[in-house]
């Protein structure tokens, strides 16, 4: 059983587990299936909008498919949520990603 299959089995047992859904998105991206990665992290964003790690990765995956408009919107939303939850490290990473996007 692959890591992705294991994670999917875990998610089937607990569909509300944000970390597992996030990890599935990362596995798809690892396989360069950015469409599936984006779909998975968008689902996570709908289910648990306050799961801050989602935003940096999701924005990056939008960049991988050359969708800079969505990447920018995701980074900005993540920045707001990170600040709201006082996650200064995530806010810093999201701001850096946004700045890098603006420099392109």
Where are these regions (language model features)?
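Conserved structural position within tetratricopeptide repeats
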Residues: 9-12, 43-46, 80
């Amino acid at each position: 059983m692959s890591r992705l299959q294991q994670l999917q089995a875990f998610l089937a047992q607990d569909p509300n587990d944000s970390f597992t859904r996030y990890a599935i998105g990362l596995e798809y991206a690892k396989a360069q299936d950015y469409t599936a990665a984006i779909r998975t992290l968008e689902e996570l964003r709908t289910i648990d909008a306050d799961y801050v790690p989602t935003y940096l990765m999701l924005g990056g995956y939008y960049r991988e498919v050359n969708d800079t408009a969505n990447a920018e919107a995701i980074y900005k939303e993540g920045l707001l949520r990170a600040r709201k939850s006082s996650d200064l490290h995530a806010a810093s990473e999201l701001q850096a990603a946004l700045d890098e996007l603006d420099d392109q």
